[in-house]
Design a protein with these regions (language model features):
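Surface-exposed interaction/ligand-binding surfaces
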Residues: 8-115
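N-terminal signal peptide c-region/cleavage motif recognized by signal peptidases
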Residues: 4-6
Length: 115
């Protein structure tokens, strides 16, 4: 189930960012998926993400690419977590001028205490 998703397109290029949950416990894994599409032969490239404030990467990203409708589709899946409680925001990602995702809010909480 995708809880947050943004899609922005300009011309034939597009980018979409989504997460599998918007609220996690401290240290709980979260999967960030970034899908981009751009026309074949364009100078647009998929940028690797290596840092996101307040989040840590748990594994190397899984990147997959395929040909689709005369262009290239690239999907990157990133397993991340946070050890900082609070309301954090995954920033927007830019594919090209004017082609970027919205930000994605994430709440990082302590576990509920039930004595």
């Amino acid at each position: 189930m995708i809880l947050a998703q943004t899609i922005i397109a300009q011309g034939d290029a597009s980018i979409k960012a989504s997460v599998n949950k918007n609220k996690i416990l401290l240290g709980e894994p979260l999967v960030l998926t970034i899908e981009s599409y751009f026309p074949s032969g364009s100078k647009i490239q998929f940028e690797q993400i290596d840092t996101i404030a307040h989040f840590e990467f748990l594994d190397k990203p899984v990147i997959d690419s395929s040909s689709e409708n005369g262009g290239i589709k690239v999907i990157g899946k990133y397993t991340i977590t946070s050890f900082d409680s609070g309301h954090w925001v995954i920033p927007s990602f830019t594919l090209a001028k004017g082609v970027k995702t919205d930000t994605i809010p994430i709440d990082v909480v302590f576990s509920d205490f039930n004595p």
